[in-house]
Amino acid sequence: MDIIGGQHLRQMWDDLADVYGHKTALICESSGGVVNRYSYLELNQEINRTANLFYTLGIRKGNKVALHLDNCPEFIFCWFGLAKIGAIMVPINARLLREESEWILQNSQACLLVTSAQFYPMYQQIQQEDATQLRHICLTDVALPADDGVSSFTQLKNQQPATLCYAPPLSTDDTAEILFTSGTTSRPKGVVITHYNLRFAGYYSAWQCALRDDDVYMTVMPAFHIDCQCTAAMAAFSAGATFVLVEKYSARAFWGQAQKYRATITECIPMMIRTLMVQPPSANDRQHRLREVMFYLNLSEQEKDAFCERFGVRLLTSYGMTETIVGIIGDRPSDKRRWPSIGRAGFCYEAEIRDDHNRPLPAGEIGEICIKGVPGKTIFKEYFLNPKATAKVLEADGWLHTGDTGYRDEEGFFYFVDRRCNMIKRGGENVSCVELENIIATHPKIQDIVVVGIKDSIRDEAIKAFVVLNEGETLSEEEFFRFCDKIWRNLKCPLIWRSEKICHVIARGK
């Protein structure tokens, strides 16, 4: 079943501009409170200008362009501007530092980068080492360094015409994005996402929350993540609704923003719900128009009930991952919800619980959650240049092994139990224990290291490191955290450490 009618992203935006014209498409609020608004017509023109900018810089169909940006209008311009000319977006987690960012540049084959002055010094060093294919950097800030190979994104964009200058033939099977996601190995894998994937995601996610063109979908989730892109942005645009993109999450500002923009749909992770609950009660707690809150694992029933009662909202559960593109299991619109179930398989999908021998299990039995979709259409196409990793999780007939455990009941409701992967879920982010261990182990004083997740009342899990030092060495807590801070931002830096004489358990699987 082809629900997108063979329409790629360039056609989508041209049609949206024609149909919705001056209706508000995008509202972006910066951390400083600056608000930018664009109608569907204006947004399509900005996307065209951005596509023309890339063309003048030598970008053609199939070229990869990396984005290292926080939530901002430029992210949206670049995402769809690249898609219009058949180029490929490579979003980089804005919290990553040098080593991980450089690795993604190398392995994605990105030749151009769009970033801000905040991140430029790091990429200047990477560019000088000439270890990647990166040949040019566009900065979204007004002020520019006096360096070769650097230009102003805004200045170049504003010089471009509002009509598209380069329109190569496109197919819905063409790659639109390579999104690198943390895995159980030491390095993230590039998830290949097609035009069809994104178009399908828009229709599917709009169906999941019964989105209409008079809705306002507000998100504070990072644009470099699949949920912001496919559950929120693509859903809003596909429905002709208004998409509100807030740069940074603030528990104190959240409800005021929801009221100001008259949001009707939003999305939350457990960390957000918990931080919203610790805010002082206010008479304005229910002064909003939200009818659905898209929710992603994991929350206790007590926390769920308290949140819904205080703020007068309903949680719509959705389970998925980067490889599934959308929440392939979840609550359905106008259907009964059964807490703590993660819902039922959505349309176009099949779901099973399988044992260690890949055999389906009956209701009530715990096993691996497996999903059947169509690669490149309803689930990801493949891991970029990694057929071995692709074959490990994706069967030839479209069955995807999620690596998560769960069970189902007799009525087809699924229940999440745990992640089989050696992962830590911290504040909505997947953090690989192996990745952290391998890098921390490079410290000259450290003989061995084990990283584990421990329960955290706000972020689900905190990161704890058990360190074994080389004989005769000493390492202070301050020195250890200073070393970690140089490698990672707050996302992956352990919050707790402990120096051990002997490490009995090695989390690397030894």
UniProtKB/Swiss-Prot annotation:
<dbReference type="Pfam" id="PF13193">
    <property type="entry name" value="AMP-binding_C"/>
</dbReference>
<dbReference type="Pfam" id="PF00501">
    <property type="entry name" value="AMP-binding"/>
</dbReference>
<dbReference type="InterPro" id="IPR045851">
    <property type="entry name" value="AMP-bd_C_sf"/>
</dbReference>
<dbReference type="GO" id="GO:0051108">
    <property type="term" value="F:carnitine-CoA ligase activity"/>
</dbReference>
<comment type="function">
    <text>Catalyzes the transfer of CoA to carnitine, generating the initial carnitinyl-CoA needed for the CaiB reaction cycle. Also has activity toward crotonobetaine and gamma-butyrobetaine.</text>
</comment>
<dbReference type="GO" id="GO:0009437">
    <property type="term" value="P:carnitine metabolic process"/>
</dbReference>
<dbReference type="InterPro" id="IPR000873">
    <property type="entry name" value="AMP-dep_synth/lig_dom"/>
</dbReference>
<comment type="similarity">
    <text>Belongs to the ATP-dependent AMP-binding enzyme family.</text>
</comment>
<dbReference type="GO" id="GO:0006631">
    <property type="term" value="P:fatty acid metabolic process"/>
</dbReference>
<keyword id="KW-0436">Ligase</keyword>
<dbReference type="InterPro" id="IPR023456">
    <property type="entry name" value="CaiC"/>
</dbReference>
<dbReference type="InterPro" id="IPR042099">
    <property type="entry name" value="ANL_N_sf"/>
</dbReference>
<dbReference type="InterPro" id="IPR025110">
    <property type="entry name" value="AMP-bd_C"/>
</dbReference>
<protein>
    <recommendedName>
        <fullName>Crotonobetaine/carnitine--CoA ligase</fullName>
        <ecNumber>6.2.1.48</ecNumber>
    </recommendedName>
</protein>
<dbReference type="GO" id="GO:0051109">
    <property type="term" value="F:crotonobetaine-CoA ligase activity"/>
</dbReference>
<dbReference type="InterPro" id="IPR020845">
    <property type="entry name" value="AMP-binding_CS"/>
</dbReference>
<dbReference type="GO" id="GO:0031956">
    <property type="term" value="F:medium-chain fatty acid-CoA ligase activity"/>
</dbReference>
<comment type="pathway">
    <text>Amine and polyamine metabolism; carnitine metabolism.</text>
</comment>
